[in-house]
Amino acid sequence: MKGLFIRIVLAICLSLWAIDMVFPWQQIVRSKQNYHTTIQERQKLIVGTINNPVSYFIGTNGETGLEYELSKAFANYLNVDLEMFPLNSADALFQALAQGKIDIAAASLFYQQDRSEKFKLGPAYHAASWQLTYRKGERRPITLENLSGKLVIPANSALNNILLAKKEKYPSLTWETSELSQEELLFQVAEGKIDYTIATSTEVSVNQQIKPQIAIAFNVTDEFTVHWYLSDKGASELQAALLDFMNSAIENGLIARIEEKYFNHLNQFDYVDTRSYLNAIETVLPKYAPLFEKYKGDLDWHLLAAISYQESHWNPEATSPTGVRGMMMLTKATADRMNITNRLDPEQSIKAGSEYLHLLLKQMPDTILKEDRIWFALAAYNMGLGHLLDVRRLTKQLGGNPDNWLEVKKNLPLLAQKRYFTHLKYGYARGYEAFQYVENIRRYMNSIMNYYRLQQNQQDRYENENNDVISTQTQQEQR
């Protein structure tokens, strides 16, 4: 429902934005050589962003994140290369944009009246609100008026102006600013180091997956639309191209697919499940991570690990009443097909599970988009290839696109309804379980990726601090 609302807002914003910009754009010839002379000459689009688990980060398979995927698609649309230019804050992004160091600022940036007067605004492509957070188990505040502890927000944040306006209604409201990032402040709330912080609803949802102690008190604001920002000087052609691109991204489902990939699974946050899972990541996964890495094949090893957690909670001796066993919960028939002799041996189980999933991937029709193929294959892994073929046929009969995971997955529960399954080749299936199976794996995979990203960030910070100490000692000795 929220995704539909966002897409409706998106379409309205695009229409209003286009109407508002008709006059200056009447003079723009919309051919690719006129999109942006500088970008075309250098054959590169430079996009400024902020390094965080929502917008952009470098994973084991390279660059990823919502803003990266959308920027990459726009660069492809312009037929140029892409360079992501990560900075530490929104202020730094706008400074770089004003100085011409970047072509676009893209970091889940809310609409702000003052900035829209200084920079050109791209179409809205998402929406989020500001939320007050506190540590789970502590007293939940009801309004900004009755905060009993310290509220800390990032320095140079758009929040400062919002809170100044709120202070007129709540004169007792006070807050402090910090040079820490929004993510770091959320972690401090989770660890009880500060009482409250305010973050976007998207940032809160993402970080709850790795710090489940983060709790939401209330929305500080209504939803704001999210935009890209462009330079106010000489960027009309780029702005025109961006409007065309966003229109096509809505029509061909790109925006919906990216939104589903990064946000849909976040709605399933469960405190107890997340705590148990994170504990397993810390204590159990290190033992088996080398095996997931060894047998990942063309997959991301985090995905393979997430599948195994969904199947067995990384218990090599797991056995179900139906006879499936081991880390990847293989049937006897699958084990025989993959030529393994002991399903309870972790290495054999992981190897066979990976090979079987690769086999299913090869059986997916070529018409399915590359980024969606794995989700179709996982549904088949869970309920069988025959039932997947059934739900694809059913989706087509209902007027949907059988190659679009967004459209197919919503029909999975129909496989358990008599009015539908009696007309299907392979009959009844617990499609609702396959739906939840895929959603859980996506959530688990993102949690593993974020956990290891944070571990790497801490290691990098530790090494940098040590290098600074060594450098200082060397300089003192030379004196």
UniProtKB/Swiss-Prot annotation:
It is a peripheral membrane protein. PROSITE patterns: TRANSGLYCOSYLASE. One of its GO terms (biological process) is peptidoglycan catabolic process. This is Membrane-bound lytic murein transglycosylase F. Gene3D superfamilies: 1.10.530.10, Periplasmic binding protein-like II (3.40.190.10). Transmembrane segments: none annotated. It comes from Histophilus somni (strain 2336). The gene is mltF. Residues 19-266 are annotated as: Non-LT domain. The N-terminal domain does not have lytic activity and probably modulates enzymatic activity. The C-terminal domain is the catalytic active domain. CDD domains: MLTF-like, PBP2_YfhD_N. Residues 267-479 are annotated as: LT domain. SUPFAM superfamilies: Lysozyme-like, Periplasmic binding protein-like II. Its EC number is 4.2.2.n1. It catalyses: Exolytic cleavage of the (1->4)-beta-glycosidic linkage between N-acetylmuramic acid (MurNAc) and N-acetylglucosamine (GlcNAc) residues in peptidoglycan, from either the reducing or the non-reducing ends of the peptidoglycan chains, with concomitant formation of a 1,6-anhydrobond in the MurNAc residue. In the N-terminal section; belongs to the bacterial solute-binding protein 3 family. In the C-terminal section; belongs to the transglycosylase Slt family. GO terms for cellular component: cell outer membrane. Keywords: Cell outer membrane, Cell wall biogenesis/degradation, Lyase, Membrane, Signal. It holds the Pfam family SBP_bac_3.
